[in-house]
UniProtKB/Swiss-Prot annotation:
GO molecular function: rRNA binding; structural constituent of ribosome
Its job: This protein binds specifically to 23S rRNA; its binding is stimulated by other ribosomal proteins, e.g. L4, L17, and L20. It is important during the early stages of 50S assembly. It makes multiple contacts with different domains of the 23S rRNA in the assembled 50S subunit and ribosome.
Source taxon at top rank: Bacteria
Species name: Dichelobacter nodosus (strain VCS1703A)
Protein name: Large ribosomal subunit protein uL22
Keywords: Ribonucleoprotein, Ribosomal protein, RNA-binding, rRNA-binding
Gene Ontology terms describing biological process: translation
Complex formation: Part of the 50S ribosomal subunit.
HAMAP family: Ribosomal_uL22_B
Gene3D superfamilies, alphabetized: Ribosomal protein L22/L17 (3.90.470.10)
Residue ranges of coiled coil: none
UniProt family annotation: Belongs to the universal ribosomal protein uL22 family.
GO cellular component: cytosolic large ribosomal subunit
Length: 110
């Protein structure tokens, strides 16, 4: 049994979110939740919500046993980039890129 959860346009850059995703890839679900709970990174809280959603999907939709689940796949890709303007000296302006990411989590029974 496998179950997925997706989050699109999360307000964190994909590069920063991948650092956290690499820590839980292939781990047992309980271990992954523990790692994310005690991590100080902003991405950990976002990925924890997606992981909990995938666990709930597996339990409610598939009838899976939570103790048998592990993180089979986690992907973090670049989402859309919001372009903003910052005023600079002498009437100039610079572009600010606010990056987003798409997070995909698949949990599966071993």
């Amino acid at each position: 049994m496998q179950s997925i959860a997706k989050l699109r346009a999360a307000r964190i850059s994909a590069q920063k979110a991948r650092l956290v995703a690499d820590q839980i890839r292939g781990k047992h679900v309980n271990d992954a939740v523990e790692i994310l709970t005690f991590s100080q990174k902003k991405a950990a809280a976002i990925i924890l919500k997606v992981l909990n959603s995938a666990i709930a999907n597996a339990e409610n939709n598939e009838g899976a046993d939570i103790d048998e689940l592990h993180v089979a796949e986690i992907q973090v890709g670049e989402g859309m980039t919001m372009k903003r303007f910052r005023a600079r000296a002498k009437g100039r302006g610079n572009r600010i890129c606010k990056r987003t990411s798409n997070i995909f989590v698949r949990v599966q029974e071993r």
